């Protein structure tokens, strides 16, 4: 993504996406209704939206680390079924037949964040698909690859860490530390045997944590309780509510019986009269 300028520096329009086709051709997708601003045969200057690209780059590299973390925590039978990377978040679909437990989500996050903190260097190389797979790279099932493919690797000599090696043509960080931080927001079912994780990285993690802190502060004020007493306070409120609910139900039954006993001619008609 980025912007298009005239040769004299005047802004022309925005680029919403860029795709590489047939190996060497780059297609720039313009925002809606902006195609008419481009004139055939005219030279333009293209400018990358650096901040947005960096966020996309961070999220893209994070999907590779997430993929390997899932395989390490859940088992090597886990495989990628799809993904979506934007400047706001990442989405990763994978094969697994049940919901992730809180413990599994915690372990997956911890492993990805540990790899981020160690600032592992990214390396890339060109190879044939067969060479890449024979050397341990992961390829997407059913994906069509050119004769030569780009292999992205995040490696470490420590066997307890992630070793990510995948066929990929996208933009990536030079080292994992640039991702900053990683946080899983949700785990949900997409279809039978396929689950979806949505997650955020870097600055978005910081925003997410700050929002949670502010929410906790508001709850502390409402409950008039310290942070370590919030859970206990809510449990006590639930107990009081259930007692009140049971007491109210008993009072209603008692009142009905009292009315009937005092005047046997009174009865309760629950039918609804239709308007004439």
Give residue spans per PLM region.
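A glycine- and charged-residue-rich anion-binding loop/surface
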Residues: 1-276
